Amino acid sequence: MATARALLELLRWHRPSGRLILLVPAGWALWLNPQAPPAAPLLGWIVLGGLAVSGAGCIANDLWDRRIDPLVERTRNRPLASGRVGLLTAVILLLACLLLALLVVLALPAPGRGLCLALAVATLPPVLLYPSAKRWFAFPQLVLAFCWGFAVLIPWAAASGSLAGGWPLVLVWFASLAWTFGFDTVYAMSDREDDRRLGVRSSALSLGAVAPAVVAICYGLAAAALAAAAWLQGLGGLGFWLCWAIAAAGMLREALQLGRLDLPRSAYGIHFSRQVQLGALLLGLILARRG
């Protein structure tokens, strides 16, 4: 019988950074929305929905990869790969997460509920199929980035009742895509040797030696797009932009460090955690100005 610890690991809820990296773009959307700051109940529903959807995505990933994960050093101890959770239990938990996500959407404010439901339904195919992309697409991280884009669209629709957000919405959405492609490419860099051996595709393999530079460009574009969205919404001030520049420089520095030849495998996980912190710092700067 699966233990509570194994189920938490299957959902990835035992690692806060993995959940925050989805909730940070949702926060960007909520606090750069014209209706900001969001009401406390809406914020709670968005957090709960984000946990449910990310949990469902992680389970779907492990179901797709249950025969590959035992062959990869980083993933061989995952609950399904190690046999600590059975297939039926994983499927039931996946359905429970999807049901919880549906209930969250139905609890959202009425003006945007129908649109959020449509967006949630549109999210399902890419979220559930993303794990298969590494089998047929050279840049599966683009699929994940597209999935992450809904973490901006759904909160924005829930807060404002529509997607008529103009350039601020477009910029926040683009920032989420660029940031996600960057950090997930780094995540894939730790598995390059195993992926090459197993015939699995990734942007880290496809980009080769230029991967660190591309990641740096993605982070730079994300920081610039968010800055433009903040400026369009009237945020600013010397202290704000100085802190923003420091955070953006930190993101770029972390990316450029990836070009070192002596990096241990653990460095990629550390990079992932630091990106969560830097993305949250950008959100914190927005929060400080929006209240």
Q: Which role fits each region the language model picked out?
A:
Residues 1-7, 58, 62-85, 184-209, ...:
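Cytosolic, membrane-interface loops and tails of multi-pass inner-membrane proteins
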Residues 5, 228-291:
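Extended hydrophobic alpha-helices typical of membrane-associated regions
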Residues 8-9, 48, 56, 75-171, ...:
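Intramembrane alpha-helical segments
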Residues 20-29, 79, 143-159, 206-209, ...:
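Small-residue-rich segments of transmembrane alpha-helices in multi-pass membrane proteins
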Residues 26-27, 50, 98, 124-127, ...:
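Residue-level recognition of pore/gate-forming positions within transmembrane alpha-helices
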Residues 28-48, 102-118, 153-174, 224-240, ...:
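Helix-coil boundary and interhelical linker segments in multi-pass alpha-helical membrane proteins
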Residues 48, 66-120, 197-244, 277, ...:
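Multi-pass membrane catalytic core of lipid/isoprenoid biosynthesis enzymes
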Residues 50-61, 127-130, 175-180, 187, ...:
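Alpha-helical transmembrane segments of multi-pass membrane proteins
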